[in-house]
Amino acid sequence: MTVRMDKRFADLRAENRPALITYFMGGDPDFQTSLGIMKALPEAGADVIELGMPFSDPMADGPAIQLAGQRALKGGQTLKTTLDLAREFRKQDNATPIVMMGYYNPIYIYGVEKFLDDAIASGIDGLIVVDLPPEMDDELCIPALARGINFIRLATPTTDGKRLPAVLKNTSGFVYYVSMNGITGSALPDPSLISGAVGRIKAHTELPVCVGFGVKTADHAKAIGAVADGVVVGSAIVNQIAGSLTKDGQATADTVPAVTTLVKGLSTGVRASRLAAAE
């Protein structure tokens, strides 16, 4: 783990509460608005920020995040300018961990070594690359770990006991449990099923297990936070951004406040989750 990631999860354990991990697409709908959103997230209650890397063929993403990526690409967002977002954010916040999430193709084109150098310089703490399985660890995972950048793996309901050790072998930072099969933005599954899955993963690792896909409301966050080390929210935030834009996809004065309001509510739910579990 990086020092920031280590410290954040240690602090959360001391507070006996799960992390709120918030995803948004870098550059959606434009660089400056995206930076405004990113800067507002920690004060609204985000503990870890997932920064989406826009890509033209996002196979694991639902319609909301696909459209966010299209808006970002249309506005000229690139992998370099996504790193620039993190670099600008670090000028005011050196405590909140940043995890870049996306696909391998843009990183490969950018150049793995150059990307890792620039990621470190920009204050990136971890990577989630959804289309790189453990069998391809030499491509990016091993070089990233050697540089001190966390490589966070996804586990799913179909990741069985045979596959799980391979998934977890080089995982660091936290484990991201995708609480259903399918694309992002789907419905929330039964929390009791999630509890069992989290326990199954924890039998194989001491890393925090964070749960995402389908979390949309404070009540969802409260329910998942009661059984997981972190709650990941993505599509709900992306939808909040989309709903604040003009018909032609431009930011309005409501865009950043709309996201802030949503995240504050989610944070309230997460902070109430352990109290609910203890009742």
UniProtKB/Swiss-Prot annotation:
EC category name: lyase
Species per Swiss-Prot/TrEMBL record: Agrobacterium fabrum (strain C58 / ATCC 33970)
Keywords per UniProt: Amino-acid biosynthesis, Aromatic amino acid biosynthesis, Lyase, Tryptophan biosynthesis
Biological classification of the source: Bacteria, Pseudomonadati, Pseudomonadota, Alphaproteobacteria, Hyphomicrobiales
Name under which the protein is recorded: Tryptophan synthase alpha chain
Described function: The alpha subunit is responsible for the aldol cleavage of indoleglycerol phosphate to indole and glyceraldehyde 3-phosphate.
Coiled coil: none
HAMAP family reported for this sequence: Trp_synth_alpha
Keyword Lyase tagged: yes
Family: Belongs to the TrpA family.
